């Protein structure tokens, strides 16, 4: 990292805080310090590697592992939803079942039909099914053929048999009054919405993390630059003081004071270097780079955007609608209500139906089986009454009810935490904006004070402690400004993550 002169530092301050003013001319001390810094001015930035905030965000979203994980997770959920929607459409299936059976009877009995024989049969069924979405049952239409071959030594009847059903239509419903399709649709829609929110949120979260690390490095660069200037300034002051001490212009106490100040500046510079190196490493890690270029130029800080016009209520509402955690919790709550409703229906008497009608004929040849078809109608009603289940059905319902209550409380807790986070972030954003304005004014005042003190010190109107105190106050004001600047941008991008605003 190359050192910079106070003129360059003031240019940086003017760039970041938009403070534009002309420096006052400094007398003797200006010439001494200026000569010391002249050889340390930075080279032209041409040839340095630059990096902007938009580039960092784009690189993080293109290269971060979490971005790929989020993309694949969303694709998986989307494919699952499309499969779910496909299963709600008409399904055409062909089912072929070969079967072999051997009947072994008592050989001592004199009944022919009880003697040993083998049966080989094959059934083929073509069926078109459709879920009846408004009611919860399933309707079907199809065609069926069965071929049976009998192998026996002594048998009456035909050794071969064909059963043909060219048309059959039916409807079945395992639990009347319960429509699982309506609940499944609600749950799957909510899960897809939650997955979409999760993917968008993950990308915004990556942008927030990238911005946080970008501004952390930008501020650490400027702190390092400031600490380097402080050390160079104190080195120059110490050299001047030692020359003056030889002719008894500076007391020994003042000389020791400058030496302490120089050591403090060296220690602060080392801390700033470690902080800047840490910020570099964190940003490079996010971008999946081994390290950032050594000749990386000073990161630019964008202009402060206009203030947001959202109220706290609007921010909370937008945060809820864009939060994947809340949307996932709503999906879990919907599924819990589904299971509670099903358990309540199964608690009492369960009624199921299966009705079908069609045409059917039996013959010993395949062709004749399709002739002289007979119309048939079959229907069954199934009643299931738990006469003695030791309270199992009731306990299942109580379990489902308790879980639903738990999910409702969990949804309320997620909503509370989101509302708290959104409200606090909005307050921090507004507070940091006010702090930025205040610290900009403080920097300007501290700079004016420093210039005046430098003139007084050069003219012998104040001691070195007063001059270094003015320098320290300027450094404190600049550090406070950078802290407010970093907090503002972190809050800005966190609010953008929460409510998805541009």
Task: Annotate each PLM feature.
Residues 1-53:
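Bacterial Sec-dependent N-terminal signal peptides
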Residues 47-121, 176, 180-183, 187-189, ...:
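Bacterial Sec-pathway N-terminal export signals of envelope proteins
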Residues 51, 184-318, 428, 432, ...:
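Periplasmic alpha-helical coiled-coil/stalk elements that build and connect Gram-negative outer-membrane
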Residues 58-68, 75-91, 125-161, 169-187, ...:
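A glycine-/polar-enriched beta->alpha junction
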Residues 69-84, 202, 206-228, 238, ...:
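Amphipathic alpha-helical coiled-coil segments
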Residues 95-169, 300-309, 341-345, 354-385, ...:
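Small/polar, glycine/serine/threonine/aspartate-rich low-complexity segments that form flexible
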Residues 272, 324, 484:
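Metallo-beta-lactamase
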